[in-house]
């Protein structure tokens, strides 16, 4: 079996290589380079990642190729993120990176020559009724199916997730026993292409700054100023620079550059129990096409270990609405609502939250 393995320089993808070699495979290793654009944003993390990936390749006597998808990334994923932010929405570039770059452009240029592509994502694949489904990982804290929820059937059918059945601690123990150079390396955080670059610096580069008012939702009183609505997301608590907190961002007026906040975590205006999903995407197929209008599901509206129980309502015209079993804080339009089966074992698909 001919396998392409994607390396990031981290412990997870390194253990993937170790496990594949243990099973008798000799995968071809690839590092996808996307990175920030511009000398003022130069960051050493990509160089460190490539050095670590090279060390793994050398340890197992495998070839490593650096695939430069910088142009494709910026024309697709970064442009998508900036467009959503400018509209006052909350994008998820990591979701689009997986769909369009790692399993899109890479597949078209390189992956098509291999039987499977193996990655260090915490996810699984499940064969059911003759079809491949995206399954959740053993480790609920590290599960990354919400970041994979926009891939299609052809993509999920070619993917291997060798560490999906392991807990994170088990992965680190394997790396330590195998003497992998990445065994003690910290997990990466934040958006995939930013490295150590500050998110606000990235946004400021493209959208600049424009002072606007921060207004208390209940009273209409101005309580502060901000540097641009695009620096803030629905549900945000930190970084507002207001005294007498806690304060939460409740909504944004994009036209007037106003941010509305509410005082105190338990304020009813912060919460909602339903939202709509635009352009819902089924990864494999719609498993409920013959069911009634309301289906019992679990779902996520942000990257957390917890699944929320609810109902998926299929409306006329192919639209979908989610009814949550509990109040939700910070429903952010632009983010992805990710839908799972009732047991939270299969990730069925996702769509953009429109509220």
From Swiss-Prot:
Catalytic machinery residues: 97, 192
One Pfam match: tRNA_Me_trans
Entries under CDD domains matching the protein: MnmA_TRMU-like (cd01998)
Catalysed reactions listed for this entry: S-sulfanyl-L-cysteinyl-[protein] + uridine(34) in tRNA + AH2 + ATP = 2-thiouridine(34) in tRNA + L-cysteinyl-[protein] + A + AMP + diphosphate + H(+)
Entry annotated with the keyword ATP-binding: yes
Gene3D superfamilies: Adenine nucleotide alpha hydrolases-like domains, HUPs, Translation factors
Region (Interaction with target base in tRNA): 92-94
Role played: Catalyzes the 2-thiolation of uridine at the wobble position (U34) of tRNA, leading to the formation of s(2)U34.
Protein name: tRNA-specific 2-thiouridylase MnmA 1
